């Protein structure tokens, strides 16, 4: 009787172990199936250009199924495909934006003369037709231009006044103002003396402008006073054409710089795409 009991107990234990093994096997198969489901959803999301959903599901495979090695490797390959697709999308979008800036530039360009002395200038400048250089030297004025690289500059000109000015201040009747940095004699600060007259020309290039051009662009519909600041101060009110010319130069500068930035970003995406494609084509070690 005791022997029969022992046999039944052994049989019961064997059945329990078998059931446990079956449960583990079922669990593993279930996990494997779920990992493949995540991978399938990621593949479908990639086909629909839904890159964030695809990446989220690939990341989930590594977290939820750390032992599903085949699916994790497949997810890595798929992630590379996603990165390539993202860069192709970015390049296409940037190309469309570059075309927009080209159209904008071509329209704005009509308001400018391109001036370049090939003997000593590598790059030329765009000069607003409203304030041509040839007709402004005999005036007390504030003219503008844009380098071929897109850098905006202002030039303050005093004709017949000797104050050694080195900076300017733009202000409106409500007290708002912007003031340039000081441009010293070792910069673009020129003083020309003839037999009958003294001319002062100071160029505020790049950061030297310190927001004066943007201030004039913003408040171009308001009266704007320019103060020439040196040993003493001289003031004048900008004419409508002076304000409009500076506003046009400000917009042209933004367009050129925007195109340059887009071209730079496109180059980065193209370089990354080439890297990903080379990495994919490289034979496994």
Spans of model-derived segments:
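Hydrophobic/aromatic side-chain positions at a characteristic register within alpha-helices
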Residues: 39, 46-47
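Bacterial signal peptide processing site
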Residues: 29-32
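Internal interaction segment
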Residues: 196-203, 221-285
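Alpha-helical linker/edge segments of TPR/alpha-solenoid repeat scaffolds
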Residues: 79-109, 120-122
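C-terminal motif of bacterial Sec signal peptides marking the signal peptidase cleavage site
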Residues: 24-27
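N-terminal secretory signal peptides that target proteins for export/translocation
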Residues: 1-12
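Short, charge-rich amphipathic alpha-helical segments embedded
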Residues: 55-87
